[in-house]
Amino acid sequence: MMKTSLKFLWIVCLCVTGVYAQNDLPLQVDNSTIKPLQSLFSSRLQSNLEKQLMANPQWKKLIEQKKMAVGIVDLNDPNNAKFARVNGNYMMYAASLPKIAILLSAMDAIDKGELRETAEVKKDMRLMISKSDNQASTRMIDRLGYEKIEAVMTDPKYEFYDQQHGGGLWVGKRYGGGGDTNREPLKNLSHAATVTQVCRYYYLLANGQLVNEKRSKQMLNIMENPELHHKFVNTLDKIAPTARLFRKSGSWRTYHSDSILVWGNEPNRRYILVALIDDAGGEQIIRDLVKPVERALRNTLL
């Protein structure tokens, strides 16, 4: 009887390890488990997120004024991801965060033979993401063209910009320079995002679904180890110094944004977090968001 019980326990441990202890990215999961992110909405996670956010009077006011949007994806169990959001489809100016749209468009172009993957292109992609270098970003925009970026963002495969659901990711202006523009049609924004679409981007990236697994892994390598240690990263450096961080942020005037895939050594610190803020104190708000969001995630597990 004891041997049977131990054998059963060993099998259970193996199963749990297979589900929860994946350390490699992109995730190695059955494609049939990769569902549309909106279908992974969790009412319990939503309730916990709202409770944490609305407990702060300033955040509550900003959310009600549609000047603050937050999205989270719980990846502690990759086969049972959970999604929650506040002002999820409300599109805002997002400054440099939409440079992730340039990165995906470049990978799509490279994979299709439309753009040569030279040493200069590789260097510019890394500078664009890790240091948010405007000159490198503009060079990448000029290599691709606005039409290519728009085509990838509106591609039915991704639909990262969807007019029927509030818009989404968009890059229609060079960074730090003049020239022609291609603003998005709903709000005439040049650099735009919604937290839902950015969460979708990271979710598909983590699952190896952006272009293909090879290109997704390459994008993850570019986005890992950010060289700007503010916003989400400032807090995570302190509370999770060994966690792997994949991120892109942005700031311009009162607009502050950040997006991150956190991959901790322990499964209960594996999640996607996105915030868009229109407030002069947005950078500090984003720093302060991490701990309440992690509480919401932990409370969902209980």
Positions of PLM-derived features:
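Short, well-structured active-site flanking segments
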Residues: 108-126, 212-216
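Mid-domain, small-residue-enriched loop/turn segments at the edges of structured enzyme/sensor domains
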Residues: 140-210
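Bacterial Sec-dependent N-terminal signal peptides
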Residues: 1-24
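Active-site SXXK
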Residues: 92-115, 128, 273
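A short, well-structured edge-of-sheet supersecondary motif
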Residues: 48-87
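Acidic helix-start/capping segments at beta-turn-to-alpha-helix junctions
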Residues: 64-76, 120-133, 142-146, 170, ...
